[in-house]
């Protein structure tokens, strides 16, 4: 097993052996679900070593799922059951519905499901049987499932991210159109009020091209309006969010704005649930990949497993550490809303990360490698601040 997979597996709240021991004492049956948009294939593994039984296929509808749970409850005399299915585009509706019936359900990480190298046959039936069998043996790794509140905030931050991507694409198209026709802006900064005033003065020889310009400009403005609206909604939602105090604590860090802080916690939830900062780094795919055998040890690029949204946010935040460490007015205003201990951790982090960025850059490292290394350590400091905000031990040496 590679180091990345081993470390990633350790992120879970219990080991495979612990889950196996607990499952064997609690659950009478293990139900594998291969969930698709319109259907769910169902397999059942009873306690023991018997081969899983294929139960059949049901529609992916609430009524059909309720009927299935009732039938299985009667079959096992009301004893607890464990349902398992892979994380995917169908979300967590099945999870919440099964949990509401009093049975257990786990959504498992597809990338961490053990698979035989020579197995080349894949069907819904075989997948359901595999999930039931591996669930019984305790070899599945469950993912963290957000609460409905958490999922709503995550949908909001992802919508803002999608609209921002549309805005950037609209800007690129407008810029390419202008460059293609020799219309170059002489000002310092684009997409400012001055830049948009200049766009109003641009004229083309043909009316058709003038219409094209107006459409491109309108597309940029419309995208900006959507982004601004979603960001306003994020600010409005924050005070009532259960993780609002943690967001404010993370904002004491350089490079972590309200948008970045909400994105991190919307995607990961309470990051203080990780036992150590190394587990969080591995979960985000910010640790080096490794292929070691015998006496040789070879490390490669980062694993890029886990949540890519948070990884992107942290890498972007890491760029701010290329400048010397200092307490700017904006950072100080955000930090003053937090405790002295959190302020001390944030300042210690800034001094260390700015110095690390400078040292790595001086060695000739590629800029992307430098920012990734800084992002990895930044994740560790965010974990310490989250633990402090939640009243959990973190072992940071920074003191007020």
Task: Describe the residue ranges of each PLM region.
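A detector of single, family-specific signature residues
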Residues: 1-400
């Amino acid at each position: 097993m590679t180091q990345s997979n081993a470390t990633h597996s350790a992120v879970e709240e219990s080991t495979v052996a612990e889950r196996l021991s607990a499952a064997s004492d609690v659950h009478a049956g293990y139900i594998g679900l291969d969930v698709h948009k319109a259907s769910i294939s169902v397999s059942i593994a009873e306690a023991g070593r018997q081969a899983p039984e294929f139960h059949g296929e049901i529609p992916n509808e609430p009524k059909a799922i309720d009927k299935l749970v009732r039938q299985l409850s009667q079959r096992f005399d009301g004893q607890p059951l464990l349902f398992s299915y892979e994380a995917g585009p169908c979300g967590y509706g099945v999870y919440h519905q099964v949990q509401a019936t009093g049975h257990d359900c786990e959504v498992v990480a597809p990338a961490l499901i053990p698979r035989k190298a020579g197995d080349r046959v894949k069907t819904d039936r075989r997948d359901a049987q595999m999930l039931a069998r591996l669930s019984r043996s305790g070899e599945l790794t469950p993912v963290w499932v957000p609460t409905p509140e958490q999922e709503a905030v995550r949908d909001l931050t992802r919508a803002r991210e999608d609209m921002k991507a549309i805005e950037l694409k609209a800007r690129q198209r407008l810029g390419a159109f202008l460059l293609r026709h020799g219309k170059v802006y002489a000002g310092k900064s684009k997409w400012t009020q001055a830049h948009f005033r200049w766009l109003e003065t641009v004229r083309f020889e043909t009316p058709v091209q003038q219409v094209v310009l107006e459409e491109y400009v309108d597309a940029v403005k419309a995208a900006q309006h959507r982004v601004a609206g979603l960001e306003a909604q994020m600010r409005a939602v924050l005070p009532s969010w259960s993780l609002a105090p943690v967001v404010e604590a993370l904002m004491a860090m350089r490079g972590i704005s309200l948008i970045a802080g909400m994105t991190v916690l919307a995607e990961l939830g309470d990051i203080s649930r990780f036992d150590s900062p190394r587990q969080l780094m591995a979960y985000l795919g910010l640790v080096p990949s490794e292929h070691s055998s015998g006496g040789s040890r070879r490390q490669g690029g980062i694993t890029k497993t886990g949540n890519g949204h948070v990884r992107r946010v942290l890498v972007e935040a890491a760029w701010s550490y290329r400048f010397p460490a200092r307490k700017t007015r904006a950072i100080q205003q955000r930090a003053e809303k937090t405790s002295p201990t959190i302020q001390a951790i944030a300042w210690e982090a800034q001094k260390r990360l700015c110095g690390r960025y400078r040292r790595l850059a001086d060695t000739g490292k590629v800029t992307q490698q430098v920012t990734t290394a800084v992002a990895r350590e930044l994740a560790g400091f965010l974990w310490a601040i989250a633990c402090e905000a939640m009243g959990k031990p973190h072992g940071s040496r920074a003191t007020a």
